């Protein structure tokens, strides 16, 4: 499981070249001409991703994280879930499948959680 911010997810998208994850969760698509890996690696959250092992020192994404993002990009089935509590901000989650692989991407405010 990886917990990061919306900006952290953007850094991972730029490094892996995954242009789109889940627009249903209000996540912006990657613009390859502007959102380059070099630019993303200069973002302060890149150091946090390196500290938790999502990125290596060369700026490459962990292979498992790359696979999770690929499932989101190439999904053939997706289920959107909204969990709300009165008076609180809802948590939204996309449960996505590609072939036999399943990945969940949750969003609560600025935090995102990605896991199989």
For each feature predicted by the language model, list its residue ranges.
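Short, amphipathic alpha-helical interface elements at domain boundaries
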Residues: 1-50, 54-74
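Accessory beta->alpha helical hairpin/"wing" motif in late/C-terminal subdomains of nucleic-acid enzymes
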Residues: 56-103, 107-116
